[in-house]
């Protein structure tokens, strides 16, 4: 539908309108032209490292990701140390009830966040998606803050994950120095990223398959153990049930304990939004993204909520092995490993430790991918040095990738006596950072819908709509704010058994992400000095993807006669 047919007018550029024409043009559904040489396209020869030259209207990044890649990134991409290891510390602080409820609340939030992101990513599949949406639909300065916050988040996560990899290996061999393992895994991450988006996609596909299969195996075994089907020489040889929900209790340390689990839940879900970032490098986002977005429901429900429910049934929250203070670093504190150990299942603890190792390595690869693409998008908008706009012939943003990888060397600091201090500060930077990204996605979706209506469009012109609509985004934004408030409360009043909060240093270790985001926003505003975007000045046309409306309308016609309950299932699951 043309602009004249739809009856809307693109807002004129004024003082508070950002020009996106330079970086986001209408994208053809078949994607950009690609180099004829297969080795060049996949970064396998010297020529692939040369700068790529673009014709008018071409996008900057290659789009090699297929539907299977997006589906597995959505369903298993962010399952890592926060879920497998950090959940142990959360259980120790808040008890099984808080663990279950807090992850459920964050899961509801993420359900709405990912659907809102999916709607925007299908409409505007651009590099650095959520940063671009914040700058485009909310405020350029806020977009600057969200972009650099996201880059910093992943820059902090990479050395964290490398450190966890080294410590995880020590479960089997403590004689070889951790530095050797950090070097090995950093090398693996570099090699995978040399293959660009396709390397990331393939690694995530197979790593996610492994993580999800392992989690399913764990839940089947856990179900048997809860019913008392464990080995005779183990703990769970009699009916176990929900005894730990009664003694020592479902909710530990009261309201403080309940609030303290939120930060672990947020850290565990970090990376879920990468499926939106990957849309810019997907062969056909319109066709592939909806199915990938719908996978998030199953991951939240089955793998996070149900998996941690079994953890709460089988592991005592007072177990001394749950090292709250080192819960993100030491796989020995993983409740998944402890279940196998206490059950007397020979080799199961080693299997779960291997799963943890694969998971944290996967998150490290994701960190380089997500951070580098966002940094490139920032540079394209003039919010980062021009050097980072460089894209080679295989679609790799090489300077941005190198920039992120350099942060991996911080992991070697963990070998020093001051290592734990550095680890705490890295965790402080990354722990809550994702909440600001998720809240911004919801707010950008709300603002987009408002501007879409203002400029004369209807909801029928949106090919994929968020399941909860704009109300789901309001709910997601509300939960983000509540979680940030809850974490502020625990930062000034820590639950019993947690490191004390009596100094400014202790407070900022709990809440550093907030002043960091505020600082980025101030810098962005001082740099561009552009006011908050008003609805009439939000441009909803530039960069809008072309759609095959015959195919979309045919699908809608097929679904329309179905009963209401079947239509809900189709749109949601």
Swiss-Prot record:
Topology relative to the membrane: Multi-pass membrane protein
Keywords: Amino-acid transport, Membrane, Transmembrane, Transmembrane helix, Transport
GO cellular component: membrane
Expression triggers: During mycoparasitism.
Organism: Hypocrea atroviridis
Gene3D superfamilies attached to this UniProt entry: Amino acid/polyamine transporter I (1.20.1740.10)
Record carries keyword Cell membrane: no
Name under which the protein is recorded: Amino-acid permease inda1
MF-aspect GO terms: amino acid transmembrane transporter activity
Principal location listed in the UniProt entry: membrane
Stretches that traverse the bilayer: 72-92, 99-117, 176-200, 212-229, 257-280, 296-315, 351-371, 398-415, 425-444, 470-494, 511-527
Pfam families: AA_permease (PF00324)
Family in the record: Belongs to the amino acid-polyamine-organocation (APC) superfamily.
Subcellular location: Membrane
Record keyword Protease present: no
